[in-house]
């Protein structure tokens, strides 16, 4: 005879068998499907640009695309991280790592100039149109092609609102992030970040940059020193092109300033106002892209398209003059003179930075200061008594040598980067 314990075990087994028949087969068994295996290959919110997006891009007027402030958002992001991140930023911090103006490694280039991409579904219609416009300009002026990603593309760009404006440089491998967050969706910012992805660092990081610009270390925040490194000439090429003040890859003169004073000053004084102000590719930008990817395009600039008004090629609008052409910058349009506060007698500006602050001339908070330092530019002078040019500007802070920082010799890391 079976004891009570055995009977209890049999009863439990019978209950389990009975319950198993009551459970639906979909819950009793679960198998991995083809969809489960493919899911990790896709981003949850990823989409691609549609034909409607490209149609909207064509409708964007040149004035609308170009009516934007200078692209200072890139060089004034929080935490001094700059707009180069990912493997490129990590490599630049290694002991043996160096930055390069244009990548020379075949591995870093996108095969045949084909760049698979997806974008975040968070972008609205206007933002997608700006992205599509940037893609169109690459397609029409270079052999670079941004194409929707397929399941066969392991290396691709994911463009999303991640954290500010940044990109890796060249083809990094796998899912490669390019962030164009709120505030970054401007045409010039988009082509700048995409040019990083194509394979280019900043123009002011060229190895020969000290022949063309001066770094004012006294005005740079310590945490941003590595944003002013130099590229390694032995491992890269400038593709036979001169230093390009007009490049869309150049930072502005106030980049990473800790005190509002200039950090980058051009050796040619009139170029200080030019650097970092590009709203489109320069002719040299396009030449370097086409040379890097062996595009079936001319390797020289068509001189017939150069006039006194600058580059007249196709695309977004007027092009900047060639760097070799020394054209004076046009003076800012004079503001209406206010008779009630007009300054009688000899009148002039007391600083060479007034052109940057013209929007503050009639500000309630800044009017008194602007009247004191920028009377001529702000239109506070009586026209008959105004002098024709500004008074001697307040001198900039002294320039330090390449191996010096604002507080003496720079650490080895910064000496290595320039």
Curated annotation (Swiss-Prot):
<dbReference type="InterPro" id="IPR001506">
    <property type="entry name" value="Peptidase_M12A"/>
</dbReference>
<keyword id="KW-0479">Metal-binding</keyword>
<dbReference type="InterPro" id="IPR034035">
    <property type="entry name" value="Astacin-like_dom"/>
</dbReference>
<keyword id="KW-0865">Zymogen</keyword>
<dbReference type="Pfam" id="PF01549">
    <property type="entry name" value="ShK"/>
</dbReference>
<dbReference type="GO" id="GO:0008270">
    <property type="term" value="F:zinc ion binding"/>
</dbReference>
<comment type="function">
    <text>Metalloprotease.</text>
</comment>
<dbReference type="GO" id="GO:0004222">
    <property type="term" value="F:metalloendopeptidase activity"/>
</dbReference>
<feature type="propeptide">
    <location>
        <begin position="29"/>
        <end position="100"/>
    </location>
</feature>
<keyword id="KW-0862">Zinc</keyword>
<dbReference type="InterPro" id="IPR006026">
    <property type="entry name" value="Peptidase_Metallo"/>
</dbReference>
<keyword id="KW-0732">Signal</keyword>
<feature type="disulfide bond">
    <location>
        <begin position="361"/>
        <end position="378"/>
    </location>
</feature>
<keyword id="KW-0378">Hydrolase</keyword>
<keyword id="KW-0964">Secreted</keyword>
<feature type="signal peptide">
    <location>
        <begin position="1"/>
        <end position="28"/>
    </location>
</feature>
<dbReference type="Pfam" id="PF01400">
    <property type="entry name" value="Astacin"/>
</dbReference>
<dbReference type="GO" id="GO:0006508">
    <property type="term" value="P:proteolysis"/>
</dbReference>
<feature type="active site">
    <location>
        <position position="193"/>
    </location>
</feature>
<feature type="disulfide bond">
    <location>
        <begin position="347"/>
        <end position="381"/>
    </location>
</feature>
<dbReference type="InterPro" id="IPR024079">
    <property type="entry name" value="MetalloPept_cat_dom_sf"/>
</dbReference>
<feature type="disulfide bond">
    <location>
        <begin position="354"/>
        <end position="374"/>
    </location>
</feature>
<keyword id="KW-0165">Cleavage on pair of basic residues</keyword>
<keyword id="KW-0482">Metalloprotease</keyword>
<dbReference type="InterPro" id="IPR003582">
    <property type="entry name" value="ShKT_dom"/>
</dbReference>
<keyword id="KW-1015">Disulfide bond</keyword>
<feature type="binding site">
    <location>
        <position position="196"/>
    </location>
    <ligand>
        <name>Zn(2+)</name>
    </ligand>
</feature>
<keyword id="KW-0645">Protease</keyword>
<feature type="binding site">
    <location>
        <position position="192"/>
    </location>
    <ligand>
        <name>Zn(2+)</name>
    </ligand>
</feature>
<feature type="binding site">
    <location>
        <position position="202"/>
    </location>
    <ligand>
        <name>Zn(2+)</name>
    </ligand>
</feature>
<protein>
    <recommendedName>
        <fullName>Zinc metalloproteinase nas-8</fullName>
        <ecNumber>3.4.24.21</ecNumber>
    </recommendedName>
</protein>
<feature type="disulfide bond">
    <location>
        <begin position="165"/>
        <end position="184"/>
    </location>
</feature>
<feature type="disulfide bond">
    <location>
        <begin position="143"/>
        <end position="295"/>
    </location>
</feature>
<dbReference type="GO" id="GO:0005576">
    <property type="term" value="C:extracellular region"/>
</dbReference>
<feature type="domain" description="ShKT">
    <location>
        <begin position="347"/>
        <end position="381"/>
    </location>
</feature>
<feature type="domain" description="Peptidase M12A">
    <location>
        <begin position="101"/>
        <end position="296"/>
    </location>
</feature>
